[in-house]
Amino acid sequence: MTSHGAVKIAIFAVIALHSIFECLSKPQILQRTDHSTDSDWDPQMCPETCNPSKNISCSSECLCVTLGGGDETGTCFNMSGVDWLGHAQASDGHNDG
């Protein structure tokens, strides 16, 4: 092996070890423990729009969702079928899990 090849391998090893160290030193994101599928959660669109930068909000049963930041119009979604802990509720309002 030439010295040029050895230098390439050494640089790669240093970068790989540095990457591993950086990944292990950062706090890990907690993963959901329930195994619900996306079909359990079906938000419904509300017939209105919103714009937080202009203080235009959704009605009380809907939540404003914008994609991006700045002066952007968002879409209102009804989230009444979700208990906000990650479990979908049955149509009668009782938790099915």
From Swiss-Prot:
It comes from the Eukaryota. Disulfide bonds join C46-C62, C50-C64, C58-C76. Keywords: Disulfide bond, Glycoprotein, Secreted, Signal. GO terms for molecular function: C-X-C chemokine binding. The keyword Nucleotide-binding does not apply. GO terms for cellular component: extracellular region. Glycans are attached at N55, N78. Salivary chemokine-binding protein which binds to host chemokines CXCL1, CXCL2, CXCL3, CXCL4, CXCL5, CXCL6, CXCL7, CXCL10 and CXCL11. This is Evasin P1142. It comes from Amblyomma cajennense.
